[in-house]
UniProtKB/Swiss-Prot annotation:
Pathway: Protein modification; protein ubiquitination. Residues 223-271 form the F-box domain. It comes from the Eukaryota. Substrate recognition component of a SCF (SKP1-CUL1-F-box protein) E3 ubiquitin-protein ligase complex which mediates the ubiquitination and subsequent proteasomal degradation of target proteins. Probably recognizes and binds to phosphorylated target proteins during skeletal muscle atrophy. Recognizes TERF1. Its main location: cytoplasm. The gene is Fbxo32. The lineage of its organism: Eukaryota, Metazoa, Chordata, Craniata, Vertebrata. This is F-box only protein 32.
Amino acid sequence: MPFLGQDWRSPGQSWVKTADGWKRFLDEKSGSFVSDLSSYCNKEVYSKENLFSSLNYDVAAKKRKKDIQNSKTKTQYFHQEKWIYVHKGSTKERHGYCTLGEAFNRLDFSTAILDSRRFNYVVRLLELIAKSQLTSLSGIAQKNFMNILEKVVLKVLEDQQNIRLIRELLQTLYTSLCTLVQRVGKSVLVGNINMWVYRMETILHWQQQLNSIQISRPAFKGLTITDLPVCLQLNIMQRLSDGRDLVSLGQAAPDLHVLSEDRLLWKRLCQYHFSERQIRKRLILSDKGQLDWKKMYFKLVRCYPRREQYGVTLQLCKHCHILSWKGTDHPCTANNPESCSVSLSPQDFINLFKF
C-alpha cells in the first residue's frame, strides 16, 4: 500500500498489513519493519490523530518561520540569473506563459539603477509602468516596483543628478494612483487600500525632498564650462538631447545664454529627434522671416515623441527567446548569439508581454 509522505516529490512509503496492524516496510532486502511513531509515541497511543497533529505542527512551524523572514525583508525579490525565457503559450515541455510582473521581478533592475548607462532606461520603464501597466503587475511585483523606486529616489538625493527626471516620474505615478485608488472594489490594485494611501504619502514626501535640494558648488576650484573656448562650449551643448537642459544651461551665465540661443544648435536638435516630414508640418517663422528652431522644437515635442537613445538596453535573442541585458551572457545554442539579439526600447519591452 503506497503512502504519500510530506514531500510530494518523494516516491512514497511502503506499508504492510500485519497481525498487529499496518507497519511501514523499511528495507526490502532485509524484510524488516519499523514503527512510524515509535521514537516519540508509545504503541498504545498510536493513532491517525497523532500523525496528523505532528504534520500540522511541522507545517505551522515552517509557515511561522517564512512569515518572520518576509516581515523582516524589504529588499527586492532576488533571482540568481540575469535573464529570463519569454514564452507566450503552453507546450508539452513548458506550461503557462511569462508575464510582465515575472520579468520585472527576475531581471536585475535593482542593480541596473546603479549603472549610469542603464539608469535612464530603467527610469523610463518605471514611468511607462506607472502610466498604464501598474495593475498588470502581481502583488510581489508591485512591492518590488516601489522598492526600486525608493532606491532611485535615494540615489538622486545623494548624487543630486537627474532631479527633473525623477520629479516627472513621481508625478506620473501619483496621478495614476489617484485614479486607481478611487476605483475601490474593482480589484485594480493588489493589497489593502490603506497601504496604497501610505505609499501615496511616501511619494509626496519624496517630492518634497527633491524640491528642497540645494545644489552646492564643488569644493575644488578648477576650470568651469565658462572658462573653456567657445567651440568646446558649443560641443558640450550639442551633446544635450533635451531642450530644457539647454535653457537651464543658458540661465547659468550670460555668456552661455548667448550660445544657448544659437539657431544651428536648435536646428540640429530638431533634426535629431524628428523627421523631415514632421518638421515641415510645424514650421514657425520669426519676426525676421527666418525659421525659429527653438519654438519649433518645443512645438514638435508637444506633438510627437522624442527619439530615445540609451547606453545599455535589454535585448531579446530571436534564437532562444531569452531576454537579458546587453553585454551579459545567456545560455544560447546559436553559433553567433550576438547576431540573433535585438535591442528593445522600454515600450518594446512592455509590448512583449501584451497577449
